[in-house]
Amino acid sequence: MIYHSTRNEQLTASSTHAVLQGIAPDGGLYICDPAALHFDWRAALEKDTLSMAADILHALLPDFENMEQLVRDSYAGKFPTSDLTPLTPVADKYVLELYHGPTSAFKDVALSVLPRLIVAAAKAEGMKGDVVILTATSGDTGKAAMEGFHDVPGTRITVFYPYGGVSAVQQAQMATQEGNNVRVCAVRGNFDDAQTGVKNIFAACKDRDLHGAMLSSANSINIGRLAPQVVYYFRAYGDLVKAGRIRMGDVVDYTVPTGNFGDILAGYFAKEMGLPVGRLICASNANDVLTEFLTTGRYDKRRPFYKTTSPSMDILVSSNLERLLYLVSGDAGYVAQLMAQLNEQGWYQVSGDILARLQAVFGCGCCNDAGAAEVIGRLWREQKYLCDPHTAVAWSVAESHTRGEAPMVVLSTASPYKFPAAVLGALGEKTGSDEFAMMEQLHALTGTDIPANLRGLEGRPVRHRDVIDTGDMLNYVLSDVLK
């Protein structure tokens, strides 16, 4: 399979090169046509989770050898069960729990695999120098990426996060990360500033001598990050068949809390590969740029930025939407035009035809902090089910999109213990300033378990304290790459 840039179909790459490079030379994202794979989804569903994952990844990334072994090595000892992502019935819906990995966030599913994909890609491409991973994070990606890449030979990783824009637990997870090849730095600005800064570094270094090193990304702009996320849509569907809730071929709807659009795009990939996905519901918080876009076709980032209790969705520039625009339009020139207008003017409007194609698959909705808190409290009171604010946003939106003829799967992206203040407040409890004490308080109140990776986090030594302006990000990276 040949990948190409979303902005220029002549800029092609093998799957190994696409994973290694992360982003296309023109700033576009690498894309393939998942509908052209003729993937045997029924056969995949008959397999265990890891073999299913290997089949899906081999279909999407065919230039990698020994994918089954790569997948099994990637997940060995990192998740409590071989199913990775359990599906839990809650009221009239199903919650797909994606947070049982080593950092208690859904990013672990993909970022357990990506380091081995990049190392394998570097070997296949004959690369001799280090692969330098650059990542912007709104909270969860950074820790999951560092956990995946720490002390992996031939790699280095630098993570940027918005100063004051992540939870205390998320910041502590990153600041205490061990590893001789990891750096994390706060950026004065929001996530979009950090993400734009990373993209600008890629552009600035395109023709620069990096002493044999190569830049790549662990964000979902890298197809190697996106591809593993497709797997859990298949896993959830298979679990519903196994439980007798649906028959093979029945449609299933999914509601996804998303900011950068990667997690929900993985669901669209699954649908294009043949999985009977009905509707994909895009759930946003108060930063509702995606809700407006999927309702009107107008994408406008010129709006207030809100810090919410679901910070991983506090995003105004959704990078992976670019891939969807290409898949729906089939026109790289059109996508390039839209992206240029977004960069220069801060907005764009898609045609009525494109909007109709999007709305045939995607629904949308948004939920503010008060709405999310109401859901957290209600689910605990009525179902004794504890969820985090991102999941609560998704649940709230799913309630207005649930159809009787199709089961609704709500993707749960993080442990509630990563956001103890918001969860305790939603349960009507008094909260203080110490999020680690609040984790214990939440445990005592609900009897639910604190994830082992979060317990004792406050006592670990802080290893990373850097804070810089966005304009200093390039020099920060070069000081490491060129040393």
Region locations from a protein language model:
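PLP-dependent amino-acid enzyme catalytic core
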Residues: 1-483
